[in-house]
């Protein structure tokens, strides 16, 4: 099969304690690919993870000289927006081939993922395409501000969430980890297409 031919050319690391072999290759574009075959499993999980999370608020864009600062919550906002394309919702494309898609943002990463038992090539291509080809308009960005604003309000009503971020804020006075991953209603208002 294609997977067997692929892993035969990759670097492999065997973890004796887990009795697992992890295959790795760094592509010419810098993308790291990891494959962890699981005997006896029917479902395949695929993730596309970027090293861009909620604490990554300042950076120098490729080809630029100056540092820019983006609004708090931008990584989470992008996570939401990437699933929306001009031709429709990317979730529908995954559903059409029996795959389930999702995403999450942490302090240091954003991950886009799907699980499926069939049509892995089609779903992987969909994942790679939608993550690398964003689609934004002022209208869709403004609509998303409302959706994420509701999400922020919902989490503000959860006692465990408030306790967690209260503790983080008290421990890290000057570090961006103290700010909710989704940002604030005020910060997401500063996001434009």
Residue ranges and their predicted role:
Residues 2-5, 9, 86-193:
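Acidic/histidine-enriched segments that form metal/cofactor-coordinating
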Residues 2-90, 187:
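His/Glu-rich zincin catalytic helix
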């Amino acid at each position: 099969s294609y997977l067997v031919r692929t892993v035969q050319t990759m670097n492999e690391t065997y973890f004796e304690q887990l009795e697992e072999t992890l295959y790795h290759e760094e592509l010419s574009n810098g993308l790291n690919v990891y494959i962890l075959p699981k005997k006896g499993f029917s479902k395949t999980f695929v993730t596309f993870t970027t090293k861009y999370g909620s604490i990554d608020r300042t950076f120098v864009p490729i080809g630029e000289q100056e540092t820019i600062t983006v609004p708090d919550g931008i990584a989470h906002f992008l996570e939401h927006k990437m699933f929306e394309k001009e031709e429709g919702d990317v979730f529908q494309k995954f559903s059409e081939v029996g795959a389930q898609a999702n995403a999450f943002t942490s302090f240091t990463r954003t991950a886009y993922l799907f699980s499926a038992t069939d049509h892995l090539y089609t779903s992987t291509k969909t994942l790679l395409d939608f993550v690398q080809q964003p689609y934004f308009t002022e209208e869709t960005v403004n609509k998303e501000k409302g959706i994420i604003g509701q999400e922020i309000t919902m989490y503000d009503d959860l006692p465990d969430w408030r306790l967690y971020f209260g503790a983080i804020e008290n421990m890290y006075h000057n570090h961006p980890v103290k700010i909710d991953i989704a940002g604030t209603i005020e910060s997401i208002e500063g996001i434009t297409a």
